[in-house]
Design a protein with these regions (language model features):
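Extracytoplasmic/peripheral linker and loop segments enriched in polar/acidic and small residues
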Residues: 12, 46-68, 73, 82, ...
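Residue-level detector of anion-binding/catalytic polar loops
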Residues: 90, 134-136, 155
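Short beta-strand-centered segments that line the small-molecule binding cleft or hinge
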Residues: 167-171
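Residue-level signal for nonpolar/aromatic packing positions in well-ordered secondary structure
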Residues: 1-2, 84, 110, 128, ...
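Beta->alpha turn/N-cap motifs
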Residues: 159-164
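A local structural motif
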Residues: 94, 104-109, 126-140, 198, ...
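Append "and occasionally in soluble cytosolic enzymes with long acidic Gly/Pro-rich linkers
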Residues: 1-126, 218
């Protein structure tokens, strides 16, 4: 739902002069990136985990929300609102804030390492406010930022997750449950997902390059469809 509130097309056009192409894979710009519908080769590793994965993995090409770049997100925000309501986050009639059944408001903090990022996240904040979601922005110095990332002391951050052209053992540190609480690991999303764990181990055990590509694409799909981040 939050992804619908990030207007990449408007930001790219108005803040970056159209210089960026949005990522749609954890392994973007490589032969490891998934695309289109799931292939038969990938299904070999995904089908046994069908009960643990979102249905879209098997039926639909993954796509991030796309706007017309005008800044008018009414349609996307309507979709986001429907998803939030379905998940139990209703708009309170008095405060106009999103609250759950316990009366808790939907709010979080985004942690930044540089004031330069504020111009990127403030339009996002404004769109979230229209949904009844509160987002505060905190900018800290580099040393504090690194320490807070290492100890997972944040709600949301803006970051880049760089990947090798030959993924291997290091994938456990990014996505595996065993790294979710390991201070200093690169599992910043705190992923604890048995299906993802299994796909990571399968990737590491790939006997050749072709199998590595197939298994990485399968993992990529599982990560994308679980919406652990908002691609930018």
């Amino acid at each position: 739902a939050l992804g619908y509130a990030f207007d990449f097309e408007w930001s790219n056009q108005n803040l970056f002069y159209g210089q960026y192409r949005r990522s749609a894979s954890y392994y973007t710009n490589s032969e490891m990136a998934s695309s289109g519908l799931t292939s038969e080769a990938e299904l070999k590793y995904l089908e046994p985990l069908k009960d643990q994965l979102p249905p879209g993995v098997f039926t639909t090409e993954f796509q991030v929300p796309i706007s017309d770049g005008s800044g008018n997100l009414r349609s996307q925000l309507r979709q986001a609102g429907a998803l939030l309501s379905a998940a139990g986050w209703k708009v309170d009639a008095n405060s106009r804030k999103r609250v759950n059944s316990a009366g808790e408001s939907f709010s979080f903090e985004i942690l930044l390492v540089s004031p330069a990022f504020e111009r990127i996240v403030l339009p996002f904040k404004k769109n979230l406010e229209r949904l009844g979601i509160g987002m505060s922005v905190r900018v800290v110095d580099p040393s504090q930022y690194v320490n807070r990332l290492r100890s997972f002391d944040f709600d949301m951050v803006v970051t880049v997750i760089g990947q090798s052209l030959s993924p291997g053992n290091e994938q456990r540190e990014f996505w595996h449950s065993e790294s979710a609480d390991l201070e200093g690991s690169r599992n910043l999303m705190g992923i604890r997902n048995p299906a993802v764990d299994q796909l990571v181990e399968s990737l590491i055990a790939a006997p050749n390059r072709q199998e590595l590509i197939i298994r990485t694409k399968a993992l990529d799909r599982a990560l994308l469809w679980n919406y652990y981040l908002i691609p930018h």
